[in-house]
Amino acid sequence: MAIRFFKAATPGTRHGSVLDFSEITHKKPEKALTSWWSRSKGRNNRGIITSRHRGGGHKRLYREIDFARAKVNVPAKVAYIEYDPNRNARIALVNYQDGEKKYILHPVGLQVGQTIIASPEASIAIGNCLPLVKIPLGTEVHNIELQPGSGGQLVRAAGTVAQIVAKEGTWASLRLPSGEVRLVSQNCWATIGRVGNIDAFNLTLGKAGRSRWLGRRPHVRGSAMNPVDHPHGGGEGRAPIGRARPVSPWGRPALGAKTRKRKKFSAALILQRRK
């Protein structure tokens, strides 16, 4: 999928770019697989902001994606490739032989009319889903489970891919897109191939308004605030932050400080930290 650059007709289009949507084969979503989604806008159940810089954005219908691929040994045919406003990857509508329809993440190379299947005995082909124990070393996979039966949780963003680098006992070592090497049970399932829309990372929004369409609000620097609002605030003119190292609005170390808990359960499963 190619990137289309705007002509410099206005300041908002001068540096903007969009994808050409050449892979899309159908515009309207499957009605039975959509639902109304009221976004939290960064608030918790009490209405308190727990994630800053979220809010607004265009209304969206949620597309129910089948991350679990739980219909085992039932072949499915790819009907359409569609746009999903809730993620940067494309989605594919598949029709199972028993008449059921599902959405899955669209991997690179999967075409309309192809047949895919989730089965321990499936071939190593794009879009097929298998347990890690059945997938050979060096294979590129995505939509990986963390626990057997939990549904895919790892490697779901556009253009991402993980690689199986080793197997020992009941564990498989995966190199994730972040560079982290992690152990995952060989009973977990994964889908063959790389997630599609690999050029999504190279897009330039071009103007602040496109961020607002996505539900992203302005990220104000702490040094531009008053002392009552942020530890970096205050001072005359462009003053330094007045501290040895930067901190968050709540006084915790920020901008480079490691925040992962040392005694986290999954620490034993991480063989190499992310880069």
UniProtKB/Swiss-Prot annotation:
Q: Which gene encodes it?
A: rpl2
Keyword line: Chloroplast, Plastid, Ribonucleoprotein, Ribosomal protein
State any GO CC term.
chloroplast
Protein known as: Large ribosomal subunit protein uL2c
Matching PROSITE patterns: RIBOSOMAL_L2
**Quaternary structure and interacting proteins, as annotated:** Part of the 50S ribosomal subunit.
Residues covered by region (Disordered): 222-258
Which BP terms from GO are recorded? Answer: mitochondrial translation
Q: Which Gene3D superfamilies match?
A: 2.30.30.30, Nucleic acid-binding proteins, Ribosomal protein L2, domain 3
- Recorded superkingdom: Eukaryota
Q: Which GO terms describe its molecular function?
A: rRNA binding; structural constituent of ribosome; transferase activity
**Family per UniProt?**
Belongs to the universal ribosomal protein uL2 family.
Q: Where in the cell is it found?
A: Plastid, Chloroplast
Q: Which InterPro entries match?
A: NA-bd_OB-fold, Rib_uL2_dom2, Ribosomal_uL2, Ribosomal_uL2_bac/org-type, Ribosomal_uL2_C, Ribosomal_uL2_CS, Ribosomal_uL2_dom3, Ribosomal_uL2_RNA-bd_dom
